[in-house]
């Protein structure tokens, strides 16, 4: 039996809160360090815990998607982040979006009410901080925006660090949207049917003018000591546009499934606006994360039909993201190879996304809690969403890159299927493996596990090769809207 009576967790974001709650409920005395409100990163502004920065969407809630499947696994394992998300969700079609203020408030209330957690609101600028010395385990869950001091301390321990940029989409006031042009509706919805998004249609001339202005707009320059690398799922809109004039039309601006009520025809492009809160007083411009200068953002995005008078509640911005080369520096239990007392959790490990970060922190908490009970918790199989994500952190590659949950991380199906059948079969197989893992690992689900419901799932899963290597072809990692 491993002796873990005290733990110090640096960072009270999604991963840190998940891990802290697991350990506290296992009887560990947890000190949870959070530098807000004494200090804020360039992208944070809310003093509450679990603040969502890049978007208020946790992406698809459909279990026939990688992230939707991961959400279901987390719900069954008792995730506090999923509890908060389900309690504060706002309409967003097939996606799970939340009122981000209520979401953070929910998580903060749960953490503050947990008797086993002591919340210390101060910055930990070094892994040599005296407050960490007496802890049996130290968990670094500082997120993608770890402070300079902590980043330097971690870099010294792992031999270096990498940077890339996450870009934030602008948010505009609802009352400034011209509803004689923008219309409510979801992709493939019936004409006139109210949907979860507002949609701004563009004809060819309007799109071409917007595209040229976007390419010519002045951007915030990168610092000369930072290497710029973009993760596909949060790429700045201007960087995506540089790939070619039609990239946006086949990407975030794709018009498929929409009819412009003014013309009765499909527009050349569609820009979607997603509600930021339950009252729908503000909307973010979906897929338009950007590093344009503020004045340029106003000039360019007001070219979108319906947004000529847009009032910017928050401009888009860019922030640094820090992560380690997990296969090289982390052991399978997420401890540092250089110091087995120090563990990493969340986005700093190389998982990408809100849900994935929370899942990572949740899993680490489960692993350490099991050790207190004298057992090693087996990792879920790679056919599951959680197992595939953890396998990504363990698989050595020449150029390790962050990844979100997607079916491309899983072993191949091992049989030929039509494209439309592929995702339901991956999901059905994952459900079968996850339920079996729960029983074999002795993990009691918090809610009744959802069993496979795909047509012919029982026959298909029996024919699937479960020993295959990780598929080389990955599904697109960018969030699917509407």
Curated annotation (Swiss-Prot):
It holds the Pfam family GIDA. Its cofactor is FAD. GO terms for cellular component: cytosol. One of its GO terms (biological process) is tRNA methylation. It is found in: Cytoplasm. GO terms for molecular function: flavin adenine dinucleotide binding; tRNA (uracil(54)-C5)-methyltransferase activity, 5,10-methylenetetrahydrofolate-dependent. Its EC number is 2.1.1.74. FAD binds at residues 11-16. It catalyses: uridine(54) in tRNA + (6R)-5,10-methylene-5,6,7,8-tetrahydrofolate + NADH + H(+) = 5-methyluridine(54) in tRNA + (6S)-5,6,7,8-tetrahydrofolate + NAD(+); uridine(54) in tRNA + (6R)-5,10-methylene-5,6,7,8-tetrahydrofolate + NADPH + H(+) = 5-methyluridine(54) in tRNA + (6S)-5,6,7,8-tetrahydrofolate + NADP(+). Keywords: Cytoplasm, FAD, Flavoprotein, Methyltransferase, NAD, NADP, Transferase, tRNA processing. InterPro entries: FAD/NAD-bd_sf, MnmG-rel, MnmG_N, TrmFO. Catalyzes the folate-dependent formation of 5-methyl-uridine at position 54 (M-5-U54) in all tRNAs. Belongs to the MnmG family. TrmFO subfamily. PANTHER family: GLUCOSE INHIBITED DIVISION PROTEIN A, METHYLENETETRAHYDROFOLATE--TRNA-(URACIL-5-)-METHYLTRANSFERASE TRMFO. This is Methylenetetrahydrofolate--tRNA-(uracil-5-)-methyltransferase TrmFO. The lineage of its organism: Bacteria, Pseudomonadati, Thermodesulfobacteriota, Desulfovibrionia, Desulfovibrionales.
């Amino acid at each position: 039996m491993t002796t873990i009576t005290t733990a110090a967790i640096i960072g009270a974001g999604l991963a840190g809160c998940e891990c802290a709650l697991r350990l506290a409920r296992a009887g560990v005395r947890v000190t949870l360090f959070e530098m807000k409100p004494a200090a804020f990163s360039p992208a944070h502004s809310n003093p509450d815990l679990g603040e969502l920065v890049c978007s208020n969407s946790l992406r698809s809630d459909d279990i026939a998607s990688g992230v939707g499947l991961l959400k279901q696994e987390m719900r069954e394992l008792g995730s506090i982040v999923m509890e908060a998300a389900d309690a504060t969700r706002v309409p967003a079609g097939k996606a799970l979006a939340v009122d981000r203020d209520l979401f953070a408030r929910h998580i903060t209330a749960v953490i503050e009410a947990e008797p086993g957690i002591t919340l210390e609101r101060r910055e930990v600028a070094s892994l040599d901080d005296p407050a960490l010395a007496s802890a049996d385990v130290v968990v670094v869950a500082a997120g993608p925006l770890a402070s300079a001091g902590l980043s330097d301390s971690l870099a010294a321990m792992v031999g270096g660090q990498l940077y890339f940029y996450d870009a934030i989409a602008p948010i505009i006031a609802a009352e400034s949207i011209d509803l004689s042009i923008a219309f409510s509706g979801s992709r493939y919805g019936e004409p006139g049917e109210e949907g979860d998004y507002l949609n701004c249609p563009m004809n060819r001339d309007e799109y071409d003018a917007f595209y040229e202005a976007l390419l010519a707009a002045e951007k915030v320059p990168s610092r000369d000591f930072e290497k710029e690398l973009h993760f596909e799922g949060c790429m700045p809109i201007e960087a995506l546009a540089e790939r070619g004039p039609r990239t946006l039309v086949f990407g975030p601006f794709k018009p498929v499934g929409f009819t412009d009520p003014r013309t009765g025809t499909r527009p050349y492009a569609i820009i979607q606006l997603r509600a930021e809160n339950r009252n729908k007083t503000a909307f973010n411009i979906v897929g338009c994360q950007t590093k344009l200068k503020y004045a340029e953002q106003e000039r360019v995005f007001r070219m979108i039909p319906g947004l000529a008078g847009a009032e910017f509640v928050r401009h888009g911005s860019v922030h640094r993201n820090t992560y380690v080369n997990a296969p090289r520096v982390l052991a399978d239990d997420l401890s540092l190879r250089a110091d087995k007392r120090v563990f990493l959790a969340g986005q700093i490990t190389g998982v990408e996304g809100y849900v994935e970060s929370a899942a990572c922190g949740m899993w680490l908490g489960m692993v350490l809690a099991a050790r207190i009970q004298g057992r090693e918790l087996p990792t879920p199989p790679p056919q599951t969403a959680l197992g595939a994500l953890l396998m990504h952190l363990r698989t050595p590659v020449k150029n390790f890159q962050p990844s979100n949950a997607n079916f491309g991380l899983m072993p191949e199906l091992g049989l030929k299927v039509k494209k439309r059948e592929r995702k339901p079969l991956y999901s059905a197989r994952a459900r079968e493996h996850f339920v079996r893992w729960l029983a074999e690992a002795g993990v009691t689900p918090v809610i009744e596990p959802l069993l496979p419901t795909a047509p012919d799932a029982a026959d298909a899963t029996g024919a699937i090769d479960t020993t295959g290597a990780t598929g080389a072809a990955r599904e697109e990692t960018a969030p699917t809207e509407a």
